[in-house]
């Protein structure tokens, strides 16, 4: 069942304790001719671009590193996902004893913080950790604080924040059309584009409202 939560962190501004210099393709040993679509740098902004091949990398993997997302407006946060990036770890197969320890905090003013996710005493390997917040909070700023990672580098491809904003809900699109193709299993679906939209939800099925 759809909770109504939306991705609040997409393309939002990010600042960090540090970031590594250089470019990812060079660091990974790729040349101009064979490098994949990946991060050209290790900047904090890579955390909110929803691109799994880009990532932020701190200068160290220690417990003084952090990143902070500005949601640009207050919102109620219900879940957070941390997707770590396996950058030059040279770790293969199932290795016992790996663990990720961190905390995620939220704040309305950037000064007073509350804990959203507490993984300080976590002793499990959680490279793509999705956590529903026990006590959803109304915040504007979301901060990840690193404690321990099992890899040589602290690299994160996405820090995703889910919840409900306080803006106006989007309306139904206009001029929605469905045109069946020769093979009736196929159809062309069109509608008028909506300015500044991030995406569209299309409901389909046999019910009249789908």
Where do the PLM segments sit?
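Aromatic, loop-rich ligand-recognition surfaces of beta-strand-rich domains
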Residues: 1-12, 18-21, 37, 42-117, ...
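Short, tryptophan-glycine- and acidic/Ser/Thr-enriched carbohydrate-recognition patches
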Residues: 21-32
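Conserved, compact domain cores that house catalytic/ligand-binding motifs in diverse enzymes
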Residues: 202-208
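Surface loop/turn signatures of beta-propeller and other carbohydrate-active proteins
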Residues: 122
């Amino acid at each position: 069942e759809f909770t109504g939560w939306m991705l609040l962190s997409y393309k939002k501004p990010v600042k960090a304790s540090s970031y590594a210099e250089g470019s990812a393709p060079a660091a990974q040993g790729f040349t101009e001719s064979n490098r994949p679509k990946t991060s050209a740098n290790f900047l904090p902004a890579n955390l909110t671009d929803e691109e799994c091949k880009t990532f932020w990398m701190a200068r160290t993997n220690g417990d003084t590193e952090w990143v902070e997302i500005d949601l640009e407006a207050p919102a109620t946060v219900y879940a957070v996902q941390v997707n770590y990036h396996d950058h030059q770890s040279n770790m293969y197969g199932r290795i016992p004893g790996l663990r990720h320890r961190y905390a995620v905090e939220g704040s309305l003013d950037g000064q007073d913080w509350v804990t959203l996710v507490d993984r300080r005493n976590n002793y499990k390997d959680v490279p793509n950790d999705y956590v529903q917040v026990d006590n959803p909070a109304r915040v504007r700023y979301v901060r990840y604080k690193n404690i321990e990672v099992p890899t040589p580098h602290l690299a994160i491809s996405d820090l995703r924040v889910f919840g409900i904003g306080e803006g106006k809900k989007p309306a139904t699109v206009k001029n929605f059309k469905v045109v069946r193709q020769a093979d009736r299993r196929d159809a062309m679906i069109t509608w008028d584009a909506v300015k500044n939209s991030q995406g569209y939800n299309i409901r389909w099925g046999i019910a009249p409202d789908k």
